[in-house]
A protein has these predicted regions:
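Recognizes extended acidic, P/S/T-rich segments that occur
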Residues: 51-82, 94
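Residue-level detector of high-confidence beta-strand sites
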Residues: 63, 101-103, 221
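Short, surface-exposed polybasic-aromatic patches that bind anionic ligands, especially phosphate groups
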Residues: 111-400
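Pro/Thr/Ser/Gly-rich low-complexity, intrinsically disordered linker/stalk tracts
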Residues: 20-48, 81, 98-111
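C-terminal motif of bacterial Sec signal peptides marking the signal peptidase cleavage site
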Residues: 15-16
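Bacterial N-terminal signal peptides that target proteins for export
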Residues: 1-7
């Protein structure tokens, strides 16, 4: 353990040492909330402990081995602002017997400033559309053929654990897995830490994104699966990328596979509940449509699974924008829909996959352990049929 981490652990433990207990007979645990979305636990395991389990509000979060009387720092993420959480720290011996339990509660602070978006400030995801952008000559035809006909079933994936994308955060003590591969790009070896609570989406894509907070790496998986009997992870495709990078698996004008069809980093364009709560989304969105163009990759995409050869089909990587002169404030829409619409005017959305419907992507909250979408008033599979779909435009395409 680094001196910095050891110092943090020691400082946190000072306020949590059990008065009247012999040193080492019980675990010592300190807790702090450095921001609105995370809690830091400082754990000094009890004598005889070989493993520690961490639970939040009764839900298992992680489990990991510990060394004799060596402090451990663990950060829990995906928390809600101004909310009380109760942690249970269980110490087990080499036989798996429980030898000590400590419980602590903490209240996260209110959110200060905007929630930080993933990927670099220079990423295409985080760049607003300039004034008077070039519009593609085929824009009207693409909107008329690939968007407007599907408006009746248009939706926002929020509240769906089937099609939204779940996110999990690993710590340096989270279990390290050699992630098996069953279909694409299996010639590379991928080892990554995955916390106990991580679970993929329940729909047919089984997406899962894991960010290692210590190494600053992101694991994107498609058709992810955890085998409980062998405690092993596999995926049909798995890729490691940079959550502070440019937002796709390989560089622009390169072609490569990814956990999503367009070659993007899997959490690119994903709307989070905190962004609705704060009233603004500071990045472009990810969308799908059934009518995608075959054999055409539009920058910044690096791959495609487009289905139709017609020029009126939208190529993956295309960026759409809601007419910025459309008066969103005047609409009788719920607050969350206005937040979405303003983002579509300022940042637009990139076509990232072929879907069964016209949809905008959101975070699945099954890995949070609570329904964050209900807290901001967004229903599951919220309809977007009332968006002015004919007033969207496709910005100038560039083949990659």
């Amino acid at each position: 353990m680094s001196r910095k981490i050891a110092a943090i652990v020691a400082a946190l433990l000072c306020s949590a040492c059990g008065a009247g207990s012999a040193a080492g007979t019980t675990s010592e645990v300190g807790v702090s909330a450095p921001n609105s979305w995370s809690v830091r636990l400082a754990i000094m395991p009890a004598d005889g402990a070989t493993h520690v389990e961490v639970l939040r509000d009764g839900r298992p979060i992680d489990a990991f081995p510990v060394d004799f009387r060596q402090p451990v720092s663990y950060t829990d993420y995906l928390l809600w602002p101004s909310t009380s959480f109760t942690y249970e720290i269980r110490a087990l011996d080499g036989n798996g017997q429980l030898i000590d339990t400590q419980r602590l509660s903490v209240i996260t602070p209110a959110q200060q400033g905007p929630i930080p978006p993933l990927y670099a400030a220079t990423s295409f995801w985080n760049q607003p559309i300039p004034a008077n952008p070039a519009v593609d000559p085929g824009s009207d035809a693409m909107v008329a053929k690939a968007m407007v006909p599907y408006r009746g079933a248009a939706n926002f994936w929020a509240g769906s654990n089937s099609w939204a994308k779940p996110l999990a955060y690993a710590n340096s003590v989270s279990p390290l897995y050699k992630v098996g591969c069953t279909k694409y790009d299996c010639d590379s070896t991928v080892s990554f830490r995955i916390p106990l609570y991580a679970a993929p989406s329940t729909g047919s894509d089984h997406h899962l994104v894991v960010i290692d907070s210590e190494t600053g790496k992101e694991l994107d998986m498609w058709l992810a699966a955890h085998e409980q009997v062998t405690d092993s992870w596999t995926a049909a495709a798995r890729y490691v990328t940079d959550p502070n990078g440019w937002g796709a698996i390989c560089g622009q004008k390169q072609h490569c596979g990814a956990a999503v069809a367009a070659g993007f980093a899997a959490f690119g364009g994903i709307v989070r509940p905190e962004e609705i709560a704060q009233g603004h989304i500071d990045h472009a969105l990810f969308f799908t449509t059934p009518y995608t163009r075959k054999d055409y990759i539009a920058c910044p995409a690096t791959h495609t699974d487009g289905q139709h050869l017609e020029p009126a089909a939208i190529p993956q990587g295309a960026r759409i924008q809601l007419d910025p002169t459309f008066d969103v404030d005047a609409q009788p829409w719920p607050r969350w829909e206005k937040v979405l619409a303003r983002a579509l005017q300022k940042y637009g959305a990139y076509l990232g996959d072929t879907g069964d419907s016209l949809s905008f992507a959101a975070e699945a909250t099954l890995d949070r352990g609570y329904d964050a979408w209900s807290m901001v008033g967004v229903p599951a599979f919220a309809s977007l049929g009332n968006l002015p779909w004919s007033q969207f435009r496709v910005l100038a395409l560039k083949r990659c």
